[in-house]
């Protein structure tokens, strides 16, 4: 009986990890500043995918922090910095953005993640695009 219980626990843990499809995914974002002449298209990675979660029936009896569900979020990330071309001298031309190195299923941390249900559909350029990108690692 102990062997069956142990095997079911191992199988459950293995399936839980494989069913959680949360990985760094390629993402293209457009960056522009009001004062600068050009828009940059940046290829980066973000955390995207599905996480195993379950809904608790006894919601009335639990504290609010116990009701949050896991989301696909950053485990490790680094920042890269690009220079937006065509900026006047009084404007800082640098823009820093996160690059996902690895991801995990966990609580959404508003210190470094945008924890909204639906994204704002503003990922496009309104200015001419510049073809070169100079990156700096920070």
Swiss-Prot record:
Keywords: Disulfide bond, Glycoprotein, Hormone, Secreted, Signal. InterPro entries: Cystine-knot_cytokine (IPR029034), Glyco_hormone_CN (IPR006208), Gonadotropin_bsu (IPR001545), Gonadotropin_bsu_CS (IPR018245). PROSITE patterns: GLYCO_HORMONE_BETA_1 (PS00261), GLYCO_HORMONE_BETA_2 (PS00689). GO terms for cellular component: cytoplasm; extracellular space. Disulfide bonds join 22-72, 36-87, 39-125, 47-103, 51-105, 108-115. It is found in: Secreted. SMART domains: GHB. Residues 1-20 form the signal peptide. Residues 133-138 form a propeptide. Transmembrane segments: none annotated. The keyword Secreted applies. The keyword Signal applies. Glycans are attached at residue 43. GO terms for biological process: G protein-coupled receptor signaling pathway. GO terms for molecular function: hormone activity. Indispensable for the control of thyroid structure and metabolism. Belongs to the glycoprotein hormones subunit beta family. Heterodimer of a common alpha chain and a unique beta chain which confers biological specificity to thyrotropin, lutropin, follitropin and gonadotropin. This is Thyrotropin subunit beta. It comes from Equus caballus.
């Amino acid at each position: 009986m102990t062997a069956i219980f142990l095997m079911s626990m191992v199988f459950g843990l293995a399936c839980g990890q494989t069913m959680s499809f949360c990985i760094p995914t390629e993402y293209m974002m457009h960056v522009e500043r009001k004062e600068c002449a050009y828009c940059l298209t940046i290829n980066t990675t973000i955390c995207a995918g599905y996480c195993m979660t379950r809904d608790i029936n006894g919601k009335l009896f639990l504290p609010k922090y116990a009701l949050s569900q896991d989301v696909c979020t950053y485990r490790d990330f680094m920042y890269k910095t690009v220079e937006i071309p065509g900026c006047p001298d009084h404007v800082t031309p640098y823009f820093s953005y996160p690059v996902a190195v690895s991801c995990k299923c966990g609580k959404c941390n508003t210190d470094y993640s945008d924890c909204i249900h639906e994204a704002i559909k503003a990922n496009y350029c309104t200015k001419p695009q510049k073809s070169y990108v100079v990156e700096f690692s920070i």
